[in-house]
């Protein structure tokens, strides 16, 4: 399987089955997906549909049991070893005894970069998420939204072109979430990174994305891929426009079509 230089993630007929004491669990089935350089791609679907599992396969945190997957033309394992991506988890996962600056530099210490390079990258990443001035603060001194921005800065410090984000704003209230959505969109526009983003929120998926991947209940399959054409400098006001509502309606209809209410 060969990948174009503009293809960042290339998935073909990929499946994943977990073996358990109660028998096999079919998590993903026959997934085909291409993510191109500079795209913001959201995965949306019901709980348990495999959104996070798919992201973890891309990150080499889970191994596919069938099909093919390439990240920048190499295997997920090689991409992980090459540090080709940054990963933002659902919770900030900041170490409480380390300052924000030292939380951001932690993976860079593991990479054995020089102190000067670690600090340069950390300060640059914190500036991108508008946390410059908070370098010496500790996680408990920051709000939940600010902690998640610090987590994003840590992922950005790798200076990788691919950013993987697993429901990073899911635990935040709606107003804070809206603010961080706008900040993330500005960050994407400035850096032109490729983003794969897991969410349960239809408005969030539509607002952020250039491509929306709608998934079915387990076993997770892709039932629709919706491309948007909104301006990169869009604001939250776009959510009231007919164009936005039309895309949101298509996402909702895709989720309804793939959902079972037999439980």
What are these regions (language model features)?
Residues 44-46:
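The feature captures the beta-strand-to-loop junction immediately N-terminal to the Walker
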Residues 137-140, 158:
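Conserved signature/switch motifs of ABC ATPase nucleotide-binding domains
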């Amino acid at each position: 399987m060969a990948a174009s230089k503009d293809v960042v993630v290339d998935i073909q007929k990929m499946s994943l089955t977990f073996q358990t004491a109660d028998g096999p669990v079919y998590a993903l089935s026959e997934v085909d997906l291409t993510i191109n350089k500079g795209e913001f791609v959201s995965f949306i679907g019901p709980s348990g549909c495999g959104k996070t599992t798919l992201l973890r396969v891309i990150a080499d945190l889970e191994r596919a049991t069938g099909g093919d997957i390439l990240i920048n033309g190499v295997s997920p394992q090689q991409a992980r070893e090459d540090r080709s991506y940054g990963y933002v988890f659902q919770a900030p996962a900041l170490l409480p005894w380390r300052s924000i600056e030292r939380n951001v530099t932690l993976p860079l210490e593991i990479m054995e970069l020089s102190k000067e390079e670690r600090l340069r990258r950390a300060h640059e990443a914190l500036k991108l998420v508008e946390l410059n001035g908070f370098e010496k603060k500790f996680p408990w001194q920051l709000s939940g939204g600010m902690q998640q921005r610090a987590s994003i800065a840590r992922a950005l410090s790798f200076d990788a072109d691919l950013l993987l984000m697993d429901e990073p704003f899911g635990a935040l209230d709606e107003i804070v979430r809206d603010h961080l959505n706008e900040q993330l969109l500005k960050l994407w526009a400035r850096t032109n990174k490729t983003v794969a983003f897991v969410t349960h929120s239809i408005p969030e998926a539509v607002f952020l994305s250039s491509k929306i991947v709608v998934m079915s209940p387990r076993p997770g399959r892709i039932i629709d891929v919706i491309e948007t054409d909104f301006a990169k400098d869009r604001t939250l006001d776009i959510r009231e426009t007919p164009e936005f509502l039309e895309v949101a309606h298509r996402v909702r209809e895709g989720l309804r079509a793939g959902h079972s209410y037999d439980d």
